[in-house]
Structure formats: C-alpha cells, structure tokens
Amino acid sequence: MSYINFSAIILAAGRGNRMLSDTPKVLYQIGGKFMLQHLIDSVMQVGVSSIYVVHGYKGEMIIKEINTNQYKIPVYWILQHDLTGTGDAVQRVLPFISDDEEVLVLYGDVPFVSYKTLQRLHVIKSQCDISMLTATLPNPKGYGRIVRNQEGSVVSIIEHDDIINDDQKKIKEVSTGIFIAISNHLKCWLSTLTTHKSKNEFYLTDIIQIAHQSGYSIHTMCPDDTFEIMGVNSKSDFVDLDKQYQQRKVQCLLSSGLMIIDPNRFDLRGTLVHGKDVYIDINVIIEGHVSLGNRVKIGASCILKDTIVADDVEIYPFSIIENTTIGFQSKVGPFVRLRPGTELKEKSHVGNFVEIKNTRLGEQSKVKHLSYLGDAEIGNQVNIGAGTIICNYDGMMKHQTIIGDDVFIGADSQLVAPITIGKNVTIGAGTTVTRDVAANETIISRIRQFSILNWKRLKNKK
C-alpha cells in the first residue's frame, strides 16, 4: 500500500569523522549490503510515495553505489552543500514536498529499523502532531535524552554532549532521531532554529522543544527490539552492529534446520536457501545468493558466492567458489578455486589445488590434482591427470577447448587452445597438444628417454 501524501527523508550527508575513513559511513556493508541500501529496502515497504536522500560528503560515490533502479517508488538525491547539521539537511528537502504531506525522517547510519515499526509509527501519527521513535536503554551513553514533564509529555531532547546535571544523566529513554510530522509544521519549526555554538550546526532535535512550547502534541513508541535503533558512529559501533546482525541471521538459519557447527564463526553476506541435513563447518563465508540442496556438507574456511549446489555434494576445506553450479553427488576440494561460469555435472570430482574458470565438467569426470582448466567444454567420464593445464590465453584473446567423452589425459599435459579432442582419446603424460585430436587416438609428444654413458655431474669443490 502506498500513501499519496507520505514521503521519507533519509539523512546521509555526514562525514562520519569518528569512523576515520575515506569511505562514507553509509557505504559500509553489513551482510553484503550497504547500510543505506538496507534502510531504503525497509522504507520501501512502509508505503511512502517518494524517498529523498540527503547527501553531502562524497555524495557522488554514494549515488554511484546505491542501486535505486530496482525500486518502483522514486528515490531523489538532494545535495547538502554545507554540512551545517541535521536541521539544515531536512530544510534542503522540504521545498520539494507539499505542505500537507507527512514526512518520515530517518538516518542512513541507523540501517535496521523495520518496516513494521515504521508502519506502527505512522499509525500513531494519526493521533498527534509528531510521532517519535524512542527507546529505553540500560546504557544510554551517546544518545540524546528524552525530557518529559510531570504529566509525562515530551518537552525536549537533550543531546548527550549538552547534558549538564545528574538528573539528566539518569534518563534512560533516548531519542532515535526517527519521527513523523507534517511538512508545513516542519517548515515553521525549522525556520526558528539557531545554531549550537559548540558545533555551529542546526540540530533537528531542537524542533521538539519548539513544537511543545507551541502547543503541538508529541507521542512516542518503542521498537520491539533495540537492535532496530542501533546506529554507527565509530568502527567499534560498526563491528557491534555487524555482530548482532550475524547472530540474528544465524539463529534464523538454525531455526530453519541448517546445522552451523559454530555460529560465532559463520558469516552471511547475502542470502542463503538450503535443504535438509545441510552441515556447515567453521569459518564459512556465504556471499551473494547461495542455494544448497539436501545433505550438502561444507568444510571449514570455504567461501561460496552466487552458487547453486545440488543434493549430496561435499565441499572440502579451503575451497573458494563463485558463480558456479555444482551437480548431484559431486566432490570439491580441498583448496579448490571455482571461478565464474563453472558448471560441474553430477558425480564429478575436483580435487586438491585445482582452478576452473568458465568451464563445463561432464558427469563422473575427474580433475583431482594441481590443474588449471579455462574456457572448456569437457565431456563425461573424463580423467584429467595431475598438473594438466589448458592454455586458453594467447596474450590478447581467450580460446575454447572441447574435450569429448571418455578421454584420458596423462599428468603434466598442456592443451593449447583453440583445440578439440575427440571421444575416447588417450594422451600420454607430459604431452603438449597443439592440434585437434580425432576420436579414439592415442597421442604422445614428449621425447624418448635415453641414457648418456660415462657422464659425470659437476660438483662444487670444498
């Protein structure tokens, strides 16, 4: 459902000085996605008619990295030339929003507020002039405090740096900075803001006191989980938030039947779907979209990215797999690298220290030791000996290799592409193949072994 008179403003212009980084804070990734992208994805489900993102520090980088073409709701980028505070940032957007429109204000470094929480906040707005998201924290350090009068009404927000007495320090209810108000009201309140001397900035939070003193009603609500309002101001904050995100994802996967042997040593940087009786050992990283069939086993320290794995596959430790499809009952690893465009058909076997790129390996085919295969179509029941190399690059272009069914390739062979090897061919160990080979042939190109009589090896004099 989309509301015609309801827009969102996301503030993402700050430098993030405490991050001590050249990368804009909102472009740090959690779970394989930029923090700002997480937030936009959530807001898209709230029902707003448009989203305005205020950018400033390295805004061009932010616009380039954030994918907005995937959304049906328009996302507009608004530049804040001078970084003079959150109050000024919102003022930059309001000329583009009609006076009677409701405005949801959020922060790009608070990425995990849920759409359900925001929908509840929108419902509360129908009962008041400002609906605010607050939280009660055992340790509110760093957050602005909610000040209430004796009747319990919100009268102001005191920023952490402006706390001056013990009573204010004891306040546990904090401001998340997230609220909804009418555009015309915001314009009036913001027009009366003055800068804070300590930072020479306009604080958006000051509008709460202005609104209260003008007789406007302010209601609050808390999220179900304080994880939703966790923000990032430093590298330490980022690590804490990422850890909590991973813990929640792991619990969901465990609840769905996935066996993760050590939840503290598993990293999900995308999405994972899985079948039954799947086992994941320690230090496994999942990136992009990964699909695991039934009874899949993944050994320690593997990385899987954008990969589809069929039933009963075993992936042994230290294998790195990207954009690959692995067939039924195949075995991979240890120490294997499968690069984009690789397809392993059922019951194939790729072993120690093998690299494969843009290659189809047929059913029951094996390449078990120390090989590189690139840009190849390899048939069924092919045995590729240890140390075999497909020479697919001539310095300018990549070339294809085609290998038929039932081929045996001896150890330490080189296949110089472009080349076609027919069915049932046998290639002797140490052979360099430079021309096409017809079906059923046996070839060898190495020199014959011979002895040199009476030859003495030179030795160093001691």
UniProtKB/Swiss-Prot annotation:
UniProt pathway: Nucleotide-sugar biosynthesis; UDP-N-acetyl-alpha-D-glucosamine biosynthesis; N-acetyl-alpha-D-glucosamine 1-phosphate from alpha-D-glucosamine 6-phosphate (route II): step 2/2; Nucleotide-sugar biosynthesis; UDP-N-acetyl-alpha-D-glucosamine biosynthesis; UDP-N-acetyl-alpha-D-glucosamine from N-acetyl-alpha-D-glucosamine 1-phosphate: step 1/1; Bacterial outer membrane biogenesis; LPS lipid A biosynthesis
Binding site for UDP-N-acetyl-alpha-D-glucosamine: 11-14, 25, 80, 85-86, 107-109, 144, 159, 233, 339, 357, 372, 383
Cofactor note as given: Binds 1 Mg(2+) ion per subunit.
A molecular function GO annotation: glucosamine-1-phosphate N-acetyltransferase activity
CDD domains: GT2_GlmU_N_bac, LbH_GlmU_C
The keyword Glycosyltransferase is assigned to this record: no
SUPFAM superfamilies linked: Nucleotide-diphospho-sugar transferases (SSF53448), Trimeric LpxA-like enzymes (SSF51161)
InterPro entries assigned to the protein according to its UniProt record, in alphabetical order: Bifunctional_GlmU (IPR005882), GlmU-like (IPR050065), GlmU_C_LbH (IPR038009), Hexapep (IPR001451), Hexapep_transf_CS (IPR018357), MobA-like_NTP_Trfase (IPR025877), Nucleotide-diphossugar_trans (IPR029044), Trimer_LpxA-like_sf (IPR011004)
Keyword Repeat set for record: yes
EC class: transferase
PROSITE patterns according to UniProt: HEXAPEP_TRANSFERASES (PS00101)
Region named N-acetyltransferase: 257-462
UniProt-annotated catalytic positions: H369
HAMAP family: GlmU
UniProt family annotation: In the N-terminal section; belongs to the N-acetylglucosamine-1-phosphate uridyltransferase family.
Protein name (record): Bifunctional protein GlmU
Organism expressing this protein natively: Blochmanniella pennsylvanica (strain BPEN)
